[in-house]
Structure formats: structure tokens, C-alpha cells
Swiss-Prot record:
H(+)-stimulated, divalent metal cation uptake system. The gene is mntH. It comes from Staphylococcus epidermidis (strain ATCC 35984 / DSM 28319 / BCRC 17069 / CCUG 31568 / BM 3577 / RP62A). It is found in: Cell membrane. Belongs to the NRAMP family. GO terms for cellular component: plasma membrane. GO terms for biological process: iron ion transmembrane transport. This is Divalent metal cation transporter MntH. The lineage of its organism: Bacteria, Bacillati, Bacillota, Bacilli, Bacillales.
Amino acid sequence: MGVILLNSNNNNHEQQRSLDEINNTINFNHNDSASQKFLAFLGPGLLVAVGYMDPGNWITSMQGGAQYGYTLLFIILISSLSAMLLQSMTVRLGIATGMDLAQMTRHFLNKPVAIMFWIIAELAIIATDIAEVIGSAIALDLIFGIPLIVGALITVFDVFLLLFIMKFGFRKIEAIVGTLIFTVLAIFVFEVYISSPQITDMLNGFVPHKEIITNQGILYIALGIIGATIMPHNLYLHSSIVQSRKYDRHSIHEKAQAIKYATIDSNIQLSIAFVVNCLLLTLGAALFFGTKTEDLGGFYDLYLALKTEPALGATLGGIMSTLFAVALLASGQNSTITGTLAGQIVMEGFLKLSIPNWLRRLITRSLAVIPVIICLIVFKGNTEKIEQLLVFSQVFLSIALPFSLIPLQLATSNQNLMGPFKNKTWINIISWLLIIVLSGLNVYLIIQTFQEL
């Protein structure tokens, strides 16, 4: 790691504040009651949870349930616990140092290497955006019959919707994201209830099974679930937005309080994401496991399978499939909001460059829409090819993941930077193991994906 330049004399006062327009804007009084402090910090975790229930996770979870029943619920549990640990590290990084992960990575690396990391981070955000464009465009097609190419172009106007919402303050964004998340949650709770899953089999799914390792097919889906869980942009995002609360930046006690309640918020919201992913897998298992429709390839397959499932009947099948599309649209809109903020954090953090938000968002979304449009034109609207592009975007995110995880680990284990908030030894051991395992699994997934082409 010869490129790493540890700057022991870090000075937070010389560092531009992360997301300056929202930084230190939301009241937090450490003298309030525990419930008031919790409510003050409730919100950033919602934006982070979006990345754990994005369109890329949907196919993997439902296909896992359809093909292998409830066996992979254990993998969702382990993935969610790993996510909680890594996101708690970003919380401590942001609050303890006053820097987000992009700023900290720039602080760690010499300029040429930092620029390389910035390019990878930007490409990761574009890859994330591609999934959002595809998910939203497919949802618009399923609900309203809007052609995919028109739906993809419509998503460009999400830029202006977010800019309009931002005028009303960051709390409003948190509220809107929370509303959309609970819309998705409510839809899948209803759909799972209607599908009448076997509760005993569900509970048994949280127990590790040797088939996860011995069965090649189960292992591949398991790796897909794990590899898609930790999103690079979430690590940048979370380390910044936790700084939106007002607390004394020079008080160790107030920082400790802020870290405590921000971590509680994160764990609660990631628990909701865990439930949503379990519901997706359960829905796939309850309706399609052991049937001829168990090989669900994409959103259109899922929609059609729900609509025509004999056990549901025509009316209920129509309702279930429509609600599925509505949830997909809500998920896409949520990811738009978080992707915008993450893009701004990355550009400002790595380059110390601020451009108008509307221009930043327009550039990112345009770069995401262009590959989708080209794919639609070249393959004449072939839905299978457009969903394959979504898979490619997830593969690139897997490649980009170590470039955000390693700086996070190095920073949070550094005494000079973190002071009393540095990683404990057991956290260092687990986080390095996670980095090695996740990186190895992602490499395996990438190889498998290209072999299947």
C-alpha cells in the first residue's frame, strides 16, 4: 500500500464541509430525552436503506426463493448484519472526523491515485443510475404501457423533481424517502400474506444449510445476494448525511451521542431493508418454488408470473402484479434521490469542485440514460437485453466495491484521524475479513457472469 499517505496532522477546519447546504442544519440537543435524540437522528438511515432494496436486489432475492425455496434467508441475514457493521463505520468516520468518505480517501492517497479512485466512484454512481433508469422505465411500461425508450427519457426529469424538493429542506427528503420505503414494505407484506407461505419453512431458512456451499446453483445465487448487498455509493452517502445534525464538533461527548443515535437509526432502517429482502425471497418461494415458473429471469417474467399465477386467480393476480410494478417505480424514485446526493458528495470530496446541483444531476442521469437508449435502439426494444444491461451495471458495482471499502477500513482504524472513535480490534478483524470475502466473492461473480454470456 505504498500509495497511502497518512496525514497525521489532519485539520478539519481547513476541510470544506461535506454537503455544505445541509451540513449542521438539523437541531440535535444532547440534553434532550433519549426519545427526542433518537427522533432527531431518525432519517439518514432511511436514505441508506434504499440501496439495500434497489431493483438489482429484487431479481436476485425473488429468483433465489423461486428456485431454492427459503434456504437463502440465512444469506440475507448474514448480508444484512455485515451491512450494519460497515455502515456503522461510515457513521463514525463522518461524525468523528468531520469528513465524508470521498474527502477522506483523497486525504489518504496521492493525487494521481486519488483521481483514479474518483473516476471509479463516478462510474459506480453512473452504474447505480443505470439500474434506476431501467427499473423506473420498466415500471412505467408495466403500469401505463409507456414504451421503454420514452420511459427512460422521462426519468431525466427526476433531476428537477429532486431540486424542487431540496428547497424545502433535508428533513422533507428524508420524509419522502421514508414514505416510499414504507409503500414498498406495505406492498410486499400484503403480497406475502396473500401468498400464504409456510411459516415453519421460513423460520428454518434462517438456519445455515450445507447445500449453500455444496450446491453450485444455490452458491451462485447466494453470492449474488451478498455481492449486491453493499453498494459503494451508500458508503459515501452515509458518511456525509450523518453530519446534517447539529452537535458540537469539538465535544467528544456530543460526538459520541451523535454516533450512538446515528448508528441506532442506521440499524433500524437496515432492519427494514432486511425484512423487504426476506419478503421478496419469501414471495418467490411461496408462489413459484417447485412450479414450472421457478426460473424467473427478470422484471417482466416476475410481473407476468404474478399476473398469471393459478393459485392467485385472475383478479388477485392482476392486483399483485400491478402492486409489484408500483413498488418497482417507488424503489426507482428513491434511488434517484440517493444517487443524486452521492454524486455530489463524490465530486466535491475528491475534486473539491462544486457545480450547480441541477447540472451535476443532469450530467449523471444523461450518462446513465444514453447506454439504455443505445441498447433499446440496437436491440429494438428487446426487454431481455435491457435487463441484461442492469446485470452488467451490478457487475461493475462489484468491481468498484473494494475501492470504497479499503479506504473506509484504513481511515476508521487510524488513531490520529479517529481518536477515541477508532475501530476496536474485533471490528478491524471482522471488517478485514468482510473486505477479503466480499472482494473474493465479487471476483467470482464477475467471472461467472462473463462465462454465462
